[in-house]
Amino acid sequence: MKKIAIILAAVLCLAGCGAGDNQWAIGPFTRPSDQPVIAPDTTKVFLCPMRGELVKWQESDTFNPAAAIKDGNICVLFRSEDNSATGIGSRTSRVGYAESEDGIHMTIAPEPVLYPADDDFKALDWPGGCEDPRVAMTEDGLYVMMYTSWNRDTPRLCVATSTDLINWTKHGYAFAEAGDGRYADMACKSGSIVTKLDGDNLTIEKFDGKYLMYWGEDMVNLATSEDLIHWTPMVDEDGELLALIEPREGKFDSALTECGPPAVHTKDGIVLIYNGKSDETHAYCAGQVLFDAKQPTKVLDRLDEPFLVPELDFEKSGQYVAGTVFVEGLVRHEGKWFLYYGCADSFVGVAVSK
């Protein structure tokens, strides 16, 4: 009986770690700490250019982080909410900046680095703010951020660029010029630019002369660009947006399939880590899907089970009590993968894989 139990435990371990047919998946991941790496802070204040007054920009919640490498350190750009109102989506979001040598212990900048301002984009950004960043880097060191502008009317996927992760230039709505303006009022978010792994560096890659970006919340779509600023959604023969993957009934992603961190071109294909929401439990868990690198709209494989689920207290207690591990930041550092995620819309966590 003891021998049977040992064999059964080994089988369950292999299944849980993504062995067998899922060797293409990135991971497995483990949590290096039972505490969040970034949490709300009531001491940090910022002169809001829209309100004309000091606000505690990191007071309420810190979550949904991007990640990048700069000067050998891990940098995390996270969504931070003030306390201007109550309820999910009703505060103002700004993007904060943190830096770490080990990926766990963070030094956080005193002020946000991307936020609503009295600029050409205030109609997109205000009053909801700048949300849910994803960051990827070009081979020549330009950082490209895809983020959601939220004016509390229509969420739009927007672009910003930087050479140092601190000073950002906004470029506006990614699909503004696509399709002769047919997408001008389209609600959209969550852009995952396709990258390649070169040593420990993830850099943006071109495919047949164009950049690729998986995007979407209700379903995963694909867009192309020649300059990383102006993007065009891909459509089918009827002119409708592509639905490369969609929610699956009865699974962890039965309600939503929302793109996570920048996708990674590996020897097996293009791996997209995404966020799945359950229609039954409403929890957010993390999944992975493999696309054909020669035909990036073609799905080769997809995990049936999530590889990261809400387990720790701070992943299940906060604004979103149904539980959330919302993955948005992925970097390679000193031979390890660091995956950063939002926890219950309130904290930032990290998981690590060799």
Language-model segment annotations:
Residues 322-323, 327:
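C-terminal structured domain segments
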